[in-house]
């Protein structure tokens, strides 16, 4: 019991869950109401404001709100409090409990973005909007189109990226620099060469996967140069009969003997594979010249002393 005619103060110590404790203090005095009224009451009202938390999902580079990410907020016991898909506006949650910790988790990033790390926050005892931001980085892929050594970028290749449904995602012509792509959605892709540069052989598809990371992911496709070989048939000029055992030397432009060819019973001989051209900075430069010289013939035949020039057409 409180004596009458005294001044008293009422202050809120704890607010209901989801609301902010008011700083308001109410003063009152019990006044004597006469000998017939043993008790005197006093009515008062406190107004509580709900807590307000504003959660932003933004692009790491631009800082703009990023639509399309799947998000949820859980309490310290792992219970889901709210879940939503981000839009071009920040997401607002009211009546989270003051003093409790909550975790914002990205369950699926927007297409072309990387899953962000979860953020944990504590709800403060304030009616002001409490803001928290989660930033997403984009995926980054660097595609190199090189010669077989992997050291020189090859310009002039027509390339295409296909998604898992064989839909074209991007097409370009290679240059002397690697091709850089941002915002490829996480998943599996195929890199396809539609047309090889002059002097190179069309290569097989390269499968790759864009992973959930903001690091640059590198993909390489290598092209081998086209090769050529000399095929010869030696016959009798009059009868057309094949001549077995005739020998030839295949020489380079400086006269160096690369190999000796000897005809078989069908009058046939084939060389090994040789480069058809020189390349400069990955580009076709000059066709390579070879020379075929008959060095040994059969008894009864005249040695052909012609130096036959050989170039390979691409």
Feature locations, PLM:
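Solvent-exposed loop/turn and edge beta-strand elements of beta-rich ligand-binding domains
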Residues: 1-314
